[in-house]
């Protein structure tokens, strides 16, 4: 799992990234990896990665969140979690495995994701009721709104408690949630995949 790859300005347009990707493909093949996935950081990178054998296969839809004006249930406690906790990974992994189609991250991947959150100004919120995890959300700050990358909750009360805590913590009232692609909603390109071991696949 790599979070953020870029080339030093002095070495751009010299094939450094192409060589890095070629070496990573060879290493993945040796390690028995069947396919590689990535999320381009900028729209123009979709074309670049397509030239390296990747295809745009993952899409997402969005939903604007409108918070009702009332205080959430007091028995649901929401906190910001700045560091990796295995209990949170287990909950998130369980909830994501309930989706029809979803990339599952390993425990090691999740540790990198938590580090990336700290670097990129994101947050992980966890909702607990009687010390049991009932919901988790991962957010990033956009220019004028919050981007909700993941939102898993046991019920609407927990979901609202998480959203209310986001607004209280960040001061942002506008939130946009990223969702699995929905037929009735516009779909946007998100991620790409490349087969590494064609014979095995």
Which positions does each model-derived feature cover?
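Conserved GNAT acetyl-CoA-binding A-motif
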Residues: 21, 28-41, 170-181
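Conserved acetyl-CoA-binding loop-helix of GNAT-fold acetyltransferases
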Residues: 4-7, 13-26, 156-168
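Core nucleotidyl-transferase/polymerase catalytic module
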Residues: 3-5, 43-44, 56, 62
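Active-site/acyl-donor-binding loops of N-acyltransferases
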Residues: 50-72, 149-156, 160-201
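Conserved beta-strand segments that form the floor/walls of ligand-binding pockets within enzyme
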Residues: 1, 6, 147
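Amide-forming acyltransferase catalytic core, primarily the GNAT-like/NAT-type
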Residues: 55-151, 156-157
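Short polybasic/polar patches that bind polyanions
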Residues: 12, 29, 50
């Amino acid at each position: 799992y790599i979070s953020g790859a870029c080339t030093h300005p002095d070495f751009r347009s010299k094939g450094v990234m192409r060589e890095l990707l070629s070496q990573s493909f060879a290493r993945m093949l040796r390690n028995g990896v069947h396919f590689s996935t990535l999320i381009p950081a900028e729209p123009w990178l979709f074309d670049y990665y397509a030239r390296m054998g990747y295809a745009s296969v993952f899409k997402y839809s969005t939903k604007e969140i409108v918070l009702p004006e009332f205080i959430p249930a007091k028995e649901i406690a929401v906190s910001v979690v700045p560091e990796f906790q295995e209990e949170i990974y287990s909950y998130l992994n369980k909830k994501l495995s309930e989706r029809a189609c979803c990339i599952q991250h390993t425990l090691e991947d999740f540790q990198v994701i938590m580090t990336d959150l700290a670097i990129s100004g994101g947050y992980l919120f966890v909702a607990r009721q009687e010390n049991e995890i009932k919901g988790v959300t991962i957010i990033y700050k956009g220019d004028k709104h919050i981007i909700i990358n993941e939102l898993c909750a046991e019920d609407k009360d927990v979901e609202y408690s998480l959203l209310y805590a986001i607004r209280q913590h960040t001061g942002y009232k506008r939130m946009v949630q990223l969702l699995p692609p929905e037929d009735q909603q516009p779909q946007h390109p998100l991620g790409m995949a490349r087969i590494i071991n064609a014979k095995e696949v």
